Regions:
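Central helical "cap/lid" subdomain
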Residues: 565, 729-774
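Active-site lid/adjacent beta-loop-alpha segment flanking the redox-cofactor pocket in flavoenzymes
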Residues: 349, 353, 357, 361, ...
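Helix-loop-beta segment of a Rossmann-like dinucleotide-binding subdomain
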Residues: 94-108, 237-246, 446, 618-629, ...
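C-terminal catalytic lobe of FAD-dependent flavoproteins
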Residues: 265-326, 344, 398-465, 469-478, ...
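Helical element adjacent to the flavin cofactor pocket in flavoenzyme catalytic cores
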Residues: 111-126, 132, 251-268, 676-733
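Glycine-rich FAD pyrophosphate-binding loop
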Residues: 75-92, 223-232, 549-571
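Dinucleotide-binding Rossmann-like beta1-alpha1 core, especially the glycine-rich loop
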Residues: 140-142, 150, 574-661, 784
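FAD-binding core/adjacent interface of flavoenzyme oxidoreductases
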Residues: 13-57, 112-198, 218, 285-296, ...
Length: 904
């Protein structure tokens, strides 16, 4: 429960609360629709996050987490145990709801109570209602406890976040009354209720049999149990012997489940795979394919489960090694030793959150992990042979159980096109296949092309299915985990941070190989001759390839990764026309500066984006409703007046607003602003759709776009350029260097260095607001902020807040940047207090003294196309480069590469 975010309600004015996790309280007001003005979702935050620094931090209070916490605490370590729910135990050991009393608690309830009591006696500190929203380092975790932001800095970190159920994506799985087996079991076991008098249970695994048995014993009619595995026959005797020998009590439970169901007249239909659910007169009808032919079972509720997916997000965010397990839908598992040790010395991962194995394995490995953490911290802890023996027995039992319930791998090709795969964004299997037909060839590009996996559940319900459709078979193929790992109230994280004058940067040559680099599918080496080689197939490279191909040139464009899937689709989609407060000194640089000269290009480029939209047949969500740049003081307002004057000199439609005019136009702003500059031509668009359209148009124009093709060597041979790639040699009459952060590296190979460095920048997205909060793009005149509301209602926050490179060289978020960016946004738009942040991401950007555009006089035939504000300016720069290629004037002289030779 709690993974799909389908049950959102408004509670006491607080929008988008998960009903399945909210306890009913007297006087509570619950509404289905979001309010026009949501109440703040968290208490007023402190100025900075409080810190906790235990010896051992355990995330997750299920069997594994409880066992690890007890072992470490009894060995003398200070232990804090975090769990999102209001009581320890997890799904397997969940307690009975407080509204009920035990008549005769079963073994699971008794075991849960004993573990909780032992943990309390050992001094374990429980923090319930705690969500770890980001893992930035083994000793830096962002944690929300009771709505307050905290930072955990443990000496050892034990991850035991559990698993979520493997969804069954079939037509009708989103209908009311269809739920996961675990959700229905929570209702039945902890709350003693059922969503219907008659229930059908389907899928794969012993949990379905246990639920059916518990429902029968609770007085619920079970219409049938449909098990996807074939009926165990005589040839399963080896597995039966192993089960009985390794865990006779659990084996007996299985026998008892079947006996109870048989006595109740409940049919267990083996080899039955769910196909679809349809509304019926008296509830729902589940259709399935079975060995004896199609089956249809009608009930008031349907429980579906095809296994489990580990919650590996925190471990992946930290950089722990993972493997892909090709079973069922397929899943990522954290690679660990018997004691939960990962590839990171400070991090241990245990339980179903690391590898699916069940409660017995979780308990044994949890104890070994807790002892290992204590031993690392200098505690005298002897080896626990009994736990190692218990682990071996449990692993043997689980392996036999999996063989008994083994089913064929998930075949994504059987999904009907109208099957909803991504519930949050309502993306169908057909939409995913259509995106693949248009060139999306990875999970990442499918996600960007369709928005699958971008909703509140952050891919928990659809990522494995999308990965199957995309053919993702290794850990790097999966979408990178992002902070926050679950939706978090924006207000809770809004904490002021120091701002900066110069962004941190680095040489792009030090960057790692791209996840898609060199995956050319084993293409044979070949030689290609072309008129123009474009190096870099981001938005700028694709725009240039399209423009040059339309001129009749034979164009080949290369990208080290997947075309357009780097910084171009990691940006916020702003269409900037006015001068930026944080990109340059603006008016102080004077009318001859590069920053001022670029003013002539912005409006023209926005118009060209509209032309691209018309040609593509899509609107691309282009909106030009103006852009505000806010001033807090009269001094800042005077500086904006100078900026507006310069912009007008260059033909930009810009004006200065006093406080009264500003608040008349933007009543949603926080009070206290002195005024603003308003540029009528600014706006926004959808960068994901824009990039997809541009890629298609470039190919339609005749450009050859190659992904996963890094340039490994580049030289001049007589009158042509020779580019070496893993797939062969390309000889080109001319070269355009549009490699973004890598452009300096490409230029240096030809003996023509240019001053290009790389920087990591952040973007944040909130959930959709229930109402329109703002129409224009908003910038802050003295702080790092860009803010806008997309067509779907979500807010997009930018402002060049920095990220960093992780140990593997991949860009990632910084906790301080997330908190600081949200603080500035809240100071401008108080309504953000009622919204959750659903994701934050980073992308590489260039850090340059100014746009570097046009022919390089040092190397005939070499052209550079490197700029900030690349999304806005890509179409106009493409036209200017195409003009230069045909011998015309090209980009303004102030952007010439020769202007920067002394800075290289």
């Amino acid at each position: 429960m709690g993974a799909c975010f389908d049950c959102l309600v408004t509670i006491d004015g607080r929008a988008n609360q998960r009903a399945c996790l909210a306890k009913v309280a007297p006087g509570m007001v619950v509404e289905s629709a979001p309010p026009a003005a949501p109440a703040p979702l968290a208490p007023e935050p402190a100025s900075q996050a409080a810190e906790i620094a235990p010896d051992v931090l355990v995330v997750g209070a299920g069997p594994a987490g409880l066992s690890a916490a007890i072992a470490a605490a009894e060995a003398g370590c200070s232990v804090v145990l975090l769990d999102e729910r209001d009581a320890a135990g997890g799904q397997y050991l969940k307690p009975l709801a407080a509204s009920h009393a035990h008549a005769a608690p079963d073994r699971q309830f008794r075991q849960a109570a004993a573990l909780r009591a032992r943990a309390e006696a050992a001094g374990v500190v429980f923090q319930h209602g705690a969500t770890v929203w980001g893992a930035f380092a083994p000793d830096e975790l962002g944690v929300l406890v009771g709505g307050r932001n905290m930072v955990a800095r443990p000496r050892r970190l034990v991850l035991a976040p559990g698993a979520h159920e493997r969804p069954v994506p079939i037509p009708g799985w989103t209908l009311p009354g269809v739920m996961t087996t675990g959700a229905l079991q929570t209702l039945a076991r902890a709350n003693r209720v059922s969503p219907g008098r008659r229930v059908v249970v389907a899928g794969n695994g012993p949990l379905n049999l246990q639920l059916a048995c518990e429902l029968v014993e609770g007085g619920v009619e079970v219409a049938a149990v449909l098990e996807a595995a074939p009926k165990p026959g005589f040839r399963a005797w080896r597995e039966a012997v192993t089960l009985a020998a390794r865990a006779p009590d659990l084996a007996w439970d299985g026998v008892r489940y079947l006996a109870v169901l048989r006595r109740a007249g409940v049919k267990v239909i083996w080899g039955a795979m769910p196909e679809r659910v349809e509304p019926a007169t008296d509830g729902l009808t589940l259709h399935a394919e079975a060995p004896g032919g199609p089956r249809a079972v009608t009930a008031q509720a349907v429980a579906l489960n095809l296994g489990f997916q580990p919650e590996t997000g925190l471990a992946r965010a930290l950089g722990c090694a993972h493997r892909f397990t090709d079973s069922g839908l397929g899943r990522l598992e954290t690679i660990t030793g018997p004691d939960g040790r990962t590839s990171l010395a400070q991090v241990l991962a245990i339980g179903d959150g690391a590898q699916i194995g069940g409660a017995r394995i979780a308990l044994a490995r949890g104890r070994l992990a807790g002892l290992a953490a204590a031993r690392d911290l200098g505690r005298a802890v002897p080896d626990d042979a009994a736990s190692r023996t218990a682990l071996a027995r449990a692993e043997a039992f689980q392996a036999a159980l999996w063989r008994l319930f083994e089913v064929p791998g998930f075949d994504a090709s059987r999904l009907a096109d109208d099957t909803v795969v991504c519930r949050c964004e309502e993306v169908s299997a057909g939409a995913l296949r259509a995106a693949m037909a248009q060139g999306a060839c990875s999970l990442g590009s499918l996600k960007k092309a369709t928005r699958a996996g971008m909703g509140r559940c952050q891919g928990r319900m659809c990522a494995a299915t999308v990965a199957r459709i995309a053919g993702a078979g290794t850990e790097p193929d999966w979408a990178a985990p992002r902070a926050p790992v679950k939706p978090i109230p924006a207000l809770a994280l809004a904490m002021e941070k120091p701002e900066w004058t110069e962004a941190p940067s680095f040489e792009a040559v030090s960057l790692p190989r791209d996840a898609g680099e060199g995956r050319g599918g084993g293409r044979a080496r070949s030689e290609t001759a072309c008129d123009l080689l474009v190096i870099g197939a981001g938005v700028l490279g694709l725009a240039i390839a399209r423009a040059a191909a339309r001129e009749g040139l034979h164009v080949v464009a290369l990208d080290r990764g997947e075309p357009g899937q780097g910084a171009s689709t990691a940006n916020a989609g702003s269409l900037h026309v006015q001068l930026h407060a944080y990109d340059s000194a603006g008016a102080a640089e004077g009318p001859e500066s590069a920053a001022a000269q670029i003013l002539t290009l912005g409006p023209r480029s926005v118009a060209l984006w509209r032309d691209i939209a018309r040609e593509s047949g899509e609107a691309l969500a282009i909106r030009t409703e103006g852009g505000l740049m806010l001033a807090e003081t009269e001094a800042q307002l005077r500086a904006l007046a100078d900026k507006v004057a310069m912009e007008r000199d260059f033909g930009v439609i810009s004006s200065l607003l006093g406080a009264n005019e500003l608040y008349a136009a933007a009543p949603w702003l926080a009070p206290g602003f002195a005024g603003a500059a308003f540029c009528a031509e600014e706006g926004q668009m959808d960068p994901l759709r824009g990039l997809s359209a541009l890629l298609r148009l470039a190919r339609e124009a005749g450009a050859e776009i190659r992904g996963a093709t890094p340039v490994t060597a580049l030289s001049r041979e007589g009158s042509v350029f020779r580019a070496e790639t893993p797939e062969g040699v390309i000889r080109a009459a001319r070269v355009v260097n549009a490699a973004g952060p890598w452009a300096g590296q490409i230029a240096a190979r030809l003996g023509a260095p240019i001053p290009v460095r790389a920087t990591v920048q952040q973007v944040i997205a909130t959930e959709a607001a229930g109402a329109e909060l703002l129409r224009p793009l908003v910038l802050h005149g003295s702080r790092h902020l860009s803010l806008k509301q997309g067509d779907a209602g979500h807010l997009i926050l930018g402002g060049a807040w920095p990220g960093e490179l992780d140990a593997a060289g991949r860009p990632r978020n910084l906790r301080a940047s997330i908190e600081g960016n949200l603080w500035v946004a809240r100071s401008v738009l108080p309504a953000i207090e009622g919204l959750h942040v659903i994701r934050a991401w980073t992308g590489l950007n260039v850090l340059i003294p100014g746009p570097i555009l046009g022919a390089d006089q040092r190397v005939p035939g070499l052209f550079h196309a490197v700029t900030f504000n690349g999304w806005t300016l890509a179409p106009v720069i493409a036209e200017l480069i195409a003009e230069a290629l045909r011998g015309g004037k090209g980009p303004p002289a102030v952007f010439s590469p020769s202007a920067y030779e002394s800075r290289s």
